[in-house]
From Swiss-Prot:
Subunit structure: The 26S proteasome consists of a 20S proteasome core and two 19S regulatory subunits. The 20S proteasome core is a barrel-shaped complex made of 28 subunits that are arranged in four stacked rings. The two outer rings are each formed by seven alpha subunits, and the two inner rings are formed by seven beta subunits. The proteolytic activity is exerted by three beta-subunits PSMB5, PSMB6 and PSMB7.
Assigned GO CC terms: cytosol; nucleus; proteasome core complex; proteasome core complex, beta-subunit complex
Pfam families registered for this protein in UniProt: Proteasome
Compartments, record wording: Cytoplasm; Nucleus
UniProt KW Cytoplasm keyword: yes
SUPFAM superfamilies recorded: N-terminal nucleophile aminohydrolases (Ntn hydrolases)
Listed name of the protein: Proteasome subunit beta type-3
Annotated source species: Bos taurus (Bovine)
Any coiled-coil regions, as ranges: none
Sites of N6-acetyllysine modification: 77
Alphabetized InterPro entries for the sequence: Ntn_hydrolases_N (IPR029055), Proteasome_beta_3 (IPR033811), Proteasome_bsu_CS (IPR016050), Proteasome_sua/b (IPR001353), Proteasome_suB-type (IPR023333)
Function: Non-catalytic component of the 20S core proteasome complex involved in the proteolytic degradation of most intracellular proteins. This complex plays numerous essential roles within the cell by associating with different regulatory particles. Associated with two 19S regulatory particles, forms the 26S proteasome and thus participates in the ATP-dependent degradation of ubiquitinated proteins.
GO biological process annotation, one example: proteasome-mediated ubiquitin-dependent protein catabolic process
Length: 205
């Protein structure tokens, strides 16, 4: 068994028209044993910028803390909010530094540029190789299921409500077909003027 699937979990981000969405499941378990149903996998990295971390739970928390530390230093030094593309480089550097004994987590970044409000999503592998796309990115133990749902449901230029419905259906149906993720879903819809966070009920088994 891969160490990446030891704790389970799923994270997904999607791009809409002038908005992005990021979603994650809420389960923390040890293989098939369920521990808690409110585990945080999505972390704010700015006013309109979030990172989702799927993988080994200890490394999820370690990477989130170390990234927040680097982010605070950056914002103190630069005196401005970080851009999504710069955050991607920061995460890539953090992961690649440990490439010979990597953090077992594959991050997903979603947000809007602080000046232009241009939507941005990307994913990275566990040694920090980035992939920037214009539709959706997925990470976690049920990537095949998530890709299948996203390929079926995603459309270009979705408004925030349509985007919420699409990412919610994709996540809920994907995690239902994976034994080590699920237990509810949390969704953040990021727009120019507001961020909407919704928690979805799912099958609790």
């Amino acid at each position: 068994m891969s160490i990446m699937s030891y704790n389970g979990g799923a994270v997904m981000a999607m791009k809409g028209k002038n908005c992005v969405a990021i979603a994650a499941d809420r389960r923390f378990g040890i293989q098939a044993q369920m521990v808690t149903t409110d585990f945080q996998k999505i972390f704010p990295m700015g006013d309109r910028l979030y990172i989702g971390l799927a993988g080994l739970a200890t490394d999820v928390q370690t990477v989130a803390q170390r990234l927040k530390f680097r982010l605070n230093l950056y914002e103190l030094k630069e005196g401005r909010q970080i851009k999504p593309y710069t955050l991607m480089s920061m995460v890539a550097n953090l992961l690649y530094e440990k490439r010979f004994g990597p953090y077992y987590t594959e991050p997903v970044i979603a947000g809007l540029d602080p000046k232009t409000f241009k939507p941005f999503i990307c994913s990275l592998d566990l040694i920090g190789c980035p992939m920037v796309t214009d539709d959706f990115v997925v990470s976690g133990t049920c990537t095949e299921q998530m890709y299948g749902m996203c390929e079926s449901l995603w459309e270009p230029n979705m408004d925030p409500e349509h985007l919420f419905e699409t990412i919610s259906q994709a996540m809920l149906n994907a995690v239902d077909r994976d034994a080590v993720s699920g237990m509810g879903v949390i969704v953040h819809i990021i727009e120019k003027d507001k961020i909407t966070t919704r928690t979805l009920k799912a099958r609790m088994d």
